[in-house]
């Protein structure tokens, strides 16, 4: 969550672990399940996963992620839920890393925050920058979008006969 002069703003991210790309996000004035559902819907729209594609959604035990509505939506999309252990940040290490980067690179650096709209717009800008320009060492010091493009281009290359 982010403190503003008008109250708190809650932010949720959905991350494609293979690509290390943020594929869904949402900011909200409340911490209700609907805002994390919106982030999930954005990710589903962006990725259009195949039903039965062995997709796993890992989250912490936040009330939004273990809610009936959220669990039902995962089941409808054919996604297997996986919930981490209580108090174990290593269970959700990538999400914890993304949240830490977001807070360091946006929230602490550019605050204090006036209102919801300021946080939402800054988050939009940061997600675009993160996906398309931020260099990530684990994927070869390239942005997530470029790493993903290279991977799919490699799959499309005809294999060389021996």
Predicted regions and their residues:
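Charged DNA-binding/catalytic regions of mobile-element recombinases
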Residues: 1-162
């Amino acid at each position: 969550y982010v403190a503003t002069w008008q109250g708190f703003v809650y932010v949720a991210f959905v991350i494609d672990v293979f690509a290390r790309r943020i594929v869904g996000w949402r900011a909200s004035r409340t911490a209700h399940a609907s805002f994390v559902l919106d982030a999930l819907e954005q990710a589903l729209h962006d990725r259009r996963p195949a039903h039965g594609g062995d997709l796993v959604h890992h989250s912490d035990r936040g009330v939004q992620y273990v809610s009936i509505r959220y669990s039902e939506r995962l089941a409808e999309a054919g996604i297997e839920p996986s919930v981490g252990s209580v108090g174990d940040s290593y269970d959700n290490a990538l999400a914890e890393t993304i949240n830490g980067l977001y807070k360091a690179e946006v929230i602490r650096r550019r605050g204090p925050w006036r209102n919801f709209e300021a946080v939402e717009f800054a988050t939009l800008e940061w997600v675009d920058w993160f996906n398309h320009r931020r260099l990530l060492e684990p994927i070869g010091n390239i942005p997530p979008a470029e790493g993903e493009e290279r991977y799919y281009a490699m799959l499309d290359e005809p294999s060389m006969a021996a």
